[in-house]
């Protein structure tokens, strides 16, 4: 059916969503066009394999950009010769080489390890100008929300959806709710966007934004730089949101102008005119509104194993004795035991073993400048075993080196590394040893996130750097800086040939001049007459899933909240290029312990005990099951084990979506109903019967326990009929072609994409001249 946007006031999210609707089904699902697709080595192998098996191609290589980041070592590449000799871990090397083969086979633009532009996907997109305001951006990575800082609708997707976007350049979506978080006033000196977003997550919890797109607004947000805004939106996913967005403004335009893939000339002017309309209208309705006073935010760190375990640095480790909710109390006790902390311990007294500055949250040039200002003229504390600085991209690294930041870090005792995800998730050689405590600028502090039994505390770059110097957590506002009058080199590009490569990491000399804001551009209704696409349609496929009708099986209880995807399947099991063989990895850290010989020994975890070894239904009492990363390996592992349905109060949005793509049925039920009616049966190893056509849950005797559970009509239709999403979408080829014709005309400034990149003669960095300028620490 033809989609007609609301005529009333709309939010920023509404406007971007409306502008990308290709088709709306009668059951309420939407087919959205995707402007930008970022691809990396971990979540793409199975997607490309699916394309090859179905005889399909990548529909829009110009809208696609690939790189390697998760698996690669961050040690020096000075003597890099080949992947075979450089990447020592066999499974990591296989994923990287598989991506290289896939991008060659399908013609996808790619920044490999010998390309100076290689880096973390969420760093290279913005710095190259591939990310643009008002676009839809997806990647097989949950922190794709980063790009929402540009006023784009950006969200993580699973591998099945990666394949869907590669094949159709579209994605099937339900409309999310609107949430606005307004930060009134100005942040106090010493407070960063990392402190602010940790404060927000601590306030609303990791499920606070579930089902919503969060718009960050207010004076404090508008005062942030683009890189600080990216840190905010990066962690919107940790608040449970589908995406985070900030309206584009002059700060956005100035950052974007002149980037290699940004529009030029008349197309730039056309783009800015449109981008200026992308703001929430007066009177637009939000489903949820939260107001925060900026003055209330002070330096914030995490103490436990969830980003919501955030406290002001002036606080102390919480005491479970003060918690009445049994699930929350149990979770707090587990977190304290895992983190090796005692209740009521002052946070500033906690000692640190290692420091990590980097990641897609805080690996940009401003982050490195902030940390360098702290460590200048200082030395690492004697108890610090290792402190690493890992730039977010090769261009960030070169910029930092041109400013002399690498020397500042190295003189203080920090290691200066190559670009990559590094110790953020430990899929590469950078990991913590068991029980080591890390001051980290990354985004997740889950159990085992940075290595088996690792202990992670999240904080800002300045706070992490200060912890490295002091040897324990400190309040950055009390930290004594040294040598602030010293000069630091600042680069001057000396060759026109270098500008195409380097401009992404350098300040721009020509800021955008303010212009009169045009009238809001209305979204055109799609014409009824199909327009022939310039692209050959992808082939339909007969592939599909087994229909899901009724399921009667043993039910297993899981009395936990915030069960993240790192817990469902740890990072070491992600190094595969197949969708199967992941049964052993399911809840690995809970199901197994190493014996004295280093062999896996089963624990008494429920799925290791009869009769639950044969469980097909998992009954969870706590909220937010499957929160965290976009790894589709989580439902793959559940499916491999034999679990076909999960029942929980709520889910992480990406996990919930990924489950349906693999024929699993995640059911949302009120927590008390689960506890009162289902858990008694699950605790006994009894069977439950899930009747999807009638949306009921029964016991083994046929007694109705739940007379109705909710499920979106389109998802139910696909499960009951075993339908393949890609096949369904390709039946709408005429609508996709029609939208692409509209896009070429109305949004012509998006048409260049990654095809504008230069690969044949990427210029090598020539010697640069430097001038010296005082370091400016922008609080």
Swiss-Prot record:
UniProt-recorded name of the protein: 3-isopropylmalate dehydratase
* Enzyme Commission no: 4.2.1.33
Where in this protein does the record say Phosphothreonine is found? 494
InterPro entries hit by this protein: 3-IsopropMal_deHydase_lsu, 3-IsopropMal_deHydase_ssu, 3-IsopropMal_deHydtase_ssu/lsu, Acnase/IPM_dHydase_lsu_aba_1/3, Acoase/IPM_deHydtase_lsu_aba, Aconitase/3IPM_dehydase_swvl, Aconitase_4Fe-4S_BS, Aconitase_4Fe-4S_dom
Location of Phosphoserine modifications: 488, 495
| Other comments on record | Present with 96300 molecules/cell in log phase SD medium.
**Reactions catalysed, as given in the entry:** (2R,3S)-3-isopropylmalate = (2S)-2-isopropylmalate
Pfam families for the chain = Aconitase (PF00330), Aconitase_C (PF00694)
User: What does the record give as the function of this protein?
Assistant: Catalyzes the isomerization between 2-isopropylmalate and 3-isopropylmalate, via the formation of 2-isopropylmaleate.
The taxonomic lineage of its organism, from the top, reads:
Eukaryota, Fungi, Dikarya, Ascomycota, Saccharomycotina
- Residues that, per the record, bind [4Fe-4S] cluster: 360, 421, 424
Q: Which family does it belong to?
A: Belongs to the aconitase/IPM isomerase family.
Where do the segments described as Disordered lie? 484-518
Which keywords belong to this entry? Answer: 4Fe-4S, Amino-acid biosynthesis, Branched-chain amino acid biosynthesis, Iron, Iron-sulfur, Leucine biosynthesis, Lyase, Metal-binding, Phosphoprotein
- Which GO molecular function, any one, fits this protein according to its record? metal ion binding
UniProt biased composition (Basic and acidic residues): 501-510
Q: In which pathway does it act?
A: Amino-acid biosynthesis; L-leucine biosynthesis; L-leucine from 3-methyl-2-oxobutanoate: step 2/4
* Cofactor annotation remark: Binds 1 [4Fe-4S] cluster per subunit.
**Single biological process term from Gene Ontology:** L-leucine biosynthetic process
Cofactors required: [4Fe-4S] cluster
Work out whether the entry's keyword set contains Phosphoprotein.
yes
GO cellular component terms given for this protein: 3-isopropylmalate dehydratase complex; cytoplasmic stress granule; cytosol
Species name: Saccharomyces cerevisiae (strain ATCC 204508 / S288c) (Baker's yeast)
